[in-house]
Amino acid sequence: MINRNANRDRDRSRSNDKELKINYRIKAREVRVIFENGTQEVLSIEDAIKKAKEAGLDLVEVSPNVSPPVCKIIDYGKYKFHQEKRQKEQKKNQKVIKLKEVRMQPKIDAHDLDFKSKNILGFLKDGNKVKVTIRFRGRELAHTYLGYGILNSILEKVGDVNYVLESAAKMEGKTMFLIVAPKFKK
């Protein structure tokens, strides 16, 4: 007989492993208890839970891998709320940098080059890295110097923005590229 709920049960057990054990879910016989004022004491699990209940708080296992496990007497709901708030704050402060790519050919017109360099300028101001790619086809491969000239003119046009040349112009197969990144203030 096939157990159709096996995957669901396995997934539930995984999600419970990430959560902290509180009160009667703690399996150890003895625990090191850290009280609200910072003092520590090794107690039996029953005594520790009793002290937590007297204080109107929860016994939360914070470090299960040591012997005896370390537990804190705290308000679990408040603790979990502050943990989630801290994680959201860290996620909000995290800066995600994307790599944008601008493609062109060596036979690009001056107006098109201006338009592409304005796009590159916008990407850099938004805080994204930019990969400028020039694809050579057929006989154009004999004139790679045109690609270097185009890339240099783009760098001159983007010069008024603080940027770092992360990867200088180089050929790879039939394409020439360079990577430009914005300079961040520390």
From Swiss-Prot:
TM regions (residue ranges): none
Pfam families found in the cross-reference section: IF3_C, IF3_N
Single biological process term from Gene Ontology: ribosome disassembly
Subcellular location(s) per record: Cytoplasm
Subunit structure: Monomer.
Function per UniProt: IF-3 binds to the 30S ribosomal subunit and shifts the equilibrium between 70S ribosomes and their 50S and 30S subunits in favor of the free subunits, thus enhancing the availability of 30S subunits on which protein synthesis initiation begins.
Family note: Belongs to the IF-3 family.
Protein's name in the database: Translation initiation factor IF-3
Source lineage: Bacteria, Pseudomonadati, Spirochaetota, Spirochaetia, Spirochaetales
